[in-house]
């Protein structure tokens, strides 16, 4: 009764036949892939707070996103929730996670995947080549060690896009949330061996994100330092288009030294300010442990674009994003590529990483209060609604400053906690029902009308939706869990077809009209031709960064597009010399549009970004 699968897809029966039906994670005595909590960005109120966790959350704020296949998207997610089995503090400080802060803990009793929402997802140990599926998270966790997967394994095709050394290594783990990819490669950072080390060191008891591979074999690579003060941390990224980024990191000691130099300069200047901050203590080290995990003090200071294949001789003279931190290593401020501060944060002096206030550029500050257990009890917004949160057994009461009250009733624990009844401010009640994996199977609205969702036993995909009137819409899927048909209550049917790479090649409407899609590039998901039901064809041409360069309609007229290095559209050229030109300020805001005759529209913005 060790929690290993009783019967998995691809296993052999006594008769020598393969098991091709059933879940990949049917366990004896233990669940698999269950998270310690619900997703922080799931149900939120106010600005925002997750009432099921009692946590202040910021589900995701993007600081950098240049276009391209497998782009490097740098985002930050915050949650004041603290898991009992945390990964180390990430590069944005306690409470924050970057996409590359994903970590896998390898323990004797199991595997713990720490996601970029600050949660812990628990899996049973995996044998080499084994794949486990979390029904509640719709996530696969795999271990390398085999050249190919059995043909009955839904991930067998996606497995083959991985580099051979990754597939064959039993020390590499992989995760994905889609049969079309991408794969997240969880390996360990290389390090320079010590002078007294004769043999290569054993892999550590954890894995970190070292790369991403999509269904076309394109890669996003995270380069980690092999030695020095920031050993093991991400110092560079190469995206799927070949761009290279440098991540400038600092240690707590380096930030403390910089602070002391700045303070000395300020105090020695006759006109220098004499503020309370001049005497602020900035320690050289941080406490080794926090409620958010162990902390090595390494922080991301700035991100630079160091190489762009489309602009090999031009590089930005300023970072694309910049960050500053408090003396306690907490993220204080975020600056965009123009050097403008766009975000600011304040934390509880007694609880490292507990956010008590934040604001956007030009906006008022939202403040938060917590109870003794670390749950948010109040949000105060000087120019909006305030909210109070009261926590009871299996219920949460949310009241705003207009005295409107909602009550959430919950069932389940941890990652399977769900809201099963909601009392709205107007007195109405809605209800929801879930299966044992936490997947929605029925909803009843305030008028008592019930909608039911039929789910596939293994995948959880919705196979039918039955409305309050008893009419049913049915959905069909292929082996890659892509929708292939929709059958409506009147008997009419629409359908979709895909190629071996999962790209849409044809879709037929309820009326029987078919639209077809063609692809010139076998390593791209972008269509180059669209043929409608009349036989008319449209053609598209794309840049290496996935931007539309030219569109030719069914009449043969072509529209061409131009972009700057940041992916912003700067010109549109239509037939007969009709062109439009756009320009942007350093913050990336549209400030001018001009036509071929010189007529111009100009735009201005407030500090908050309002037009």
Where are these regions (language model features)?
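A generic local secondary-structure boundary/capping motif
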Residues: 14-17, 62-63, 291-292
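Hydrophobic/aromatic beta-strand elements that line small-molecule binding cavities or substrate pockets
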Residues: 24, 62, 184-187
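Intrinsically disordered, low-complexity segments enriched in small residues
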Residues: 30-83
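Short, conserved DNA-binding cores of transcription-related domains
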Residues: 63-68, 72-78, 93, 97-101, ...
């Amino acid at each position: 009764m060790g929690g290993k699968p009783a019967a998995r897809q691809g296993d052999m029966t006594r008769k020598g036949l393969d098991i091709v039906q059933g879940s990949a994670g049917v366990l004896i005595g233990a669940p698999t892939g269950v998270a310690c909590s619900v997703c922080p960005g799931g149900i939120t109120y106010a600005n925002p707070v997750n009432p099921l966790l009692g946590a202040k959350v910021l589900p995701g704020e993007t600081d950098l996103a240049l276009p391209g296949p497998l782009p490097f998207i740098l985002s930050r997610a915050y949650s004041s929730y603290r898991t009992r089995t945390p990964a180390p503090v990430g590069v944005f400080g306690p409470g924050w996670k970057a996409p590359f802060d994903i970590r896998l803990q390898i323990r004797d009793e199991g595997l713990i995947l720490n996601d970029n929402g600050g949660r812990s997802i628990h899996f049973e140990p995996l044998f080499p080549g084994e794949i486990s599926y979390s029904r509640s998270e719709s996530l696969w966790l795999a271990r390398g060690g085999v050249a190919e997967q059995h043909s009955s394994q839904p991930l067998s095709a996606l497995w083959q896009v991985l580099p051979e050394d990754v597939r064959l290594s039993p020390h590499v783990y992989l995760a994905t949330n889609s049969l079309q990819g991408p794969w997240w490669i969880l390996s360990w950072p290389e390090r320079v061996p010590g002078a007294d080390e004769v043999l290569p060191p054993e892999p550590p008891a954890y894995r970190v994100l070292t790369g991403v591979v999509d269904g076309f074999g394109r890669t996003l690579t995270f380069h980690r330092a092999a030695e020095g003060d920031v050993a093991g941390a991400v110092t560079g990224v190469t995206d799927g288009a070949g761009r290279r980024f440098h991540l400038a990191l600092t240690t707590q000691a380096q930030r403390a030294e910089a602070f002391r130099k700045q303070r000395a300069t300020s105090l020695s200047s006759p006109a220098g300010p004499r503020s309370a901050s001049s005497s602020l203590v900035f320690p050289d080290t941080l406490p080794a442990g926090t409620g958010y995990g162990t902390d090595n003090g390494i922080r991301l200071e700035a991100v630079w674009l160091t190489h762009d294949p489309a602009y090999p001789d031009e590089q930005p003279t300023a970072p694309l994003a910049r960050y500053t931190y408090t003396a306690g290593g907490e993220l204080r401020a975020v600056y965009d590529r123009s050097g403008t501060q766009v975000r600011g944060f304040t934390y509880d002096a007694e609880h490292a990483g507990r956010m008590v206030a934040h604001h956007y550029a030009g906006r008022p500050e939202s403040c938060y209060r917590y109870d003794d257990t670390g749950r948010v009890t109040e949000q105060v917004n000087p120019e909006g609604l305030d909210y109070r949160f009261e926590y009871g057994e299996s219920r949460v009461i949310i009241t705003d400053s207009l005295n409107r009250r909602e009550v959430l009733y919950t069932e389940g624990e941890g990652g399977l906690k769900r809201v099963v009844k909601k009392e709205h401010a107007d007195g109405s009640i809605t209800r929801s029902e879930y299966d044992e994996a936490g997947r929605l199977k029925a909803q009843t609205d305030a008028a008592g009308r019930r909608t039911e969702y039929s789910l596939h036993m293994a995948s959880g995909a919705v196979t039918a939706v039955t409305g309050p009137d008893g009419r049913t819409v049915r959905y069909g899927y292929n082996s890659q869990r892509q929708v292939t048909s929709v059958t409506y209550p009147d008997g009419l049917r629409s359908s979709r077809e895909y190629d071996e790479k999962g790209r849409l090649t044809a879709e037929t409407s309820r009326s029987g009209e078919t639209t077809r899609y063609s692809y010139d590039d076998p390593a791209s998901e972008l269509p180059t031709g669209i043929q409608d039901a009349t036989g008319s064809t449209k053609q598209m041409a794309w840049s290496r960064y996935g931007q539309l360069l030219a569109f030719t309609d069914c009449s043969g007229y072509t529209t061409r597009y131009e972009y700057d290095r940041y992916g912003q559209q700067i010109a549109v050229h239509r037939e007969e010399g009709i062109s439009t030109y756009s320009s942007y300020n350093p913050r990336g805001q549209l400030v001018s549009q001009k036509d071929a005759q010189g007529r111009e529209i100009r735009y201005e913005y407030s500090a908050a970004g309002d037009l």
